[in-house]
């Protein structure tokens, strides 16, 4: 069998940033330096001062 190198850590692209709260790499909001996934953002948005516009 051939030796397999371990993957390099991602430095750019969609999978490079992680959610600071849960650690997932899916749908991370980077705006305003939040670095939260959309699920975590919806949970704590009111405490951060964001409100829903209609």
Swiss-Prot record:
Cofactor note: Binds 1 zinc ion per subunit.
Cellular component terms (Gene Ontology): cytosolic small ribosomal subunit
Key words of the record: Metal-binding, Ribonucleoprotein, Ribosomal protein, RNA-binding, rRNA-binding, Zinc
Names of the cofactor(s): Zn(2+)
InterPro entries associated with the record: Ribosomal_uS14 (IPR001209), Ribosomal_uS14_arc (IPR023676), Ribosomal_uS14_CS (IPR018271), RIbosomal_uS14_euk_arc (IPR039744), Ribosomal_uS14_sf (IPR043140)
UniProt superkingdom: Archaea
Gene Ontology molecular functions: rRNA binding; structural constituent of ribosome; zinc ion binding
Keyword Metal-binding: yes
Single GO BP term: cytoplasmic translation
Binding positions (Zn(2+)): 19, 22, 37, 40
Keyword Cytoplasm: no
Pfam families according to UniProt: Ribosomal_S14
Family: Belongs to the universal ribosomal protein uS14 family. Zinc-binding uS14 subfamily.
Function per UniProt: Binds 16S rRNA, required for the assembly of 30S particles.
Quaternary data: Part of the 30S ribosomal subunit.
Name assigned to this protein: Small ribosomal subunit protein uS14
Natural source organism: Aeropyrum pernix (strain ATCC 700893 / DSM 11879 / JCM 9820 / NBRC 100138 / K1)
Source organism phylogeny: Archaea, Thermoproteota, Thermoprotei, Desulfurococcales, Desulfurococcaceae
Name of the coding gene: rps14
């Amino acid at each position: 069998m051939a030796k397999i190198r371990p993957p390099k850590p991602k430095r750019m692209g969609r999978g490079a940033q992680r959610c600071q709260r849960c650690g997932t790499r899916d749908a991370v909001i980077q705006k305003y330096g939040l670095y939260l996934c959309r699920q975590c953002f919806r949970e704590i948005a009111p405490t951060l001062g964001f409100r829903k516009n209609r």
